[in-house]
């Protein structure tokens, strides 16, 4: 137990404590001016807003992908299952370059979308696409083992009792998946908020337009404004912690409700 706490302190707690201590170099007025500046607020809004939206999309699409992989047998299923892990293994810079090439105005998908008046690369839409790309495996790999362990006989029993397919999904299957879905959502959100490598290539990185908070931190560091960078990092840390804490509370609540179903 003591060794575990020691490693936890060295790896996580001490660096985070150092991050908070760095902000004490600023007065409250200076700290408030940094985190409420137009550029900082917009960067935080872009990062957290798009990360939340991307995590929601991944929650839905990831569940559909898991259902297809677990409940259906089709040619190429194993290959498709392996492809899901590509964002895990792919260097983020490579992912960013690939997405930018694909969605640029002369890219395979960017060209037809541009013809429809939709611009993806170098806009917040591109950030959204990149966050979906890097986040989808977290939902799939979190929910997949739970659905695999779910006994199909329970669904058959519900059907034999006259339950419709949708009633079975929402009253039998979904309640068992909710804790895993919430975990997948939290992981996808956390990854998207902190993503840097794949996003900066497709974002455009224009201040007050498509600049993400991690990039703003790097810019402040390059300007030797370490306290400013630390202040933005602390805001991201606290906000991320609150979101993940809320999701974990919902997860525990869902687990306590599962026996009722």
Regions found by a protein language model. Give the residues of each.
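Membrane-water interface segments at the C-terminal ends of transmembrane alpha-helices
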Residues: 1-26, 34-148, 172-197, 201, ...
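Active-site/ligand-binding-proximal alpha/beta "capping" segment
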Residues: 152, 169
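Short cytosolic juxtamembrane segments of multi-pass membrane proteins
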Residues: 154, 250-261
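The alpha-helix within a helix-turn-helix
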Residues: 158
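Glycine/proline-centered hinge or cleavage motifs at structural transition points of membrane proteins
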Residues: 161-163, 175
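Juxtamembrane non-transmembrane "cap" segments at the membrane-aqueous interface
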Residues: 201-207
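Transmembrane alpha-helical segments of integral membrane proteins
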Residues: 211-216
């Amino acid at each position: 137990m003591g060794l575990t706490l020691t490693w936890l302190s060295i790896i996580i707690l001490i660096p985070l404590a150092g991050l908070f201590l760095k902000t004490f170099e600023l007065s409250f007025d200076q700290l408030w001016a940094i985190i409420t500046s137009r550029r900082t607020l917009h960067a935080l809004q872009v990062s957290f807003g798009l990360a939340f939206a991307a995590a929601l999309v991944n929650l839905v699409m990831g569940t559909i992908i898991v259902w297809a992989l677990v409940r259906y047998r089709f040619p190429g299923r194993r290959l498709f299952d392996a492809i899901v892990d590509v964002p895990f293994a792919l260097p983020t810079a490579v992912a960013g370059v690939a997405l930018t090439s694909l969605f640029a105005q002369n890219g395979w998908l960017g060209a037809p979308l541009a013809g429809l008046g939709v611009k993806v690369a170098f806009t917040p839409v591109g950030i959204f696409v990149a966050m979906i790309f890097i986040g989808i495996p977290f939902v799939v790999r979190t929910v997949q083992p739970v659905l695999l362990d779910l006994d199909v006989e329970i669904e058959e029993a519900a059907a034999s009792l006259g339950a419709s397919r949708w009633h079975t999904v929402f009253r039998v299957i979904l309640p068992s998946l909710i804790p895993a879905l919430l975990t997948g959502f939290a992981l996808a959100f956390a990854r998207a908020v902190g993503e840097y490598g794949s996003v900066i290539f497709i974002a455009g990185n224009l201040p007050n337009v498509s600049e993400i908070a991690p990039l703003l931190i790097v810019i402040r560091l390059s300007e030797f404004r370490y306290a400013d960078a630390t202040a933005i990092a602390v805001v991201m840390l606290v906000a991320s912690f609150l979101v993940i804490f809320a999701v974990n509370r919902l997860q525990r609540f869902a687990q306590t409700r599962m026996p009722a179903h």
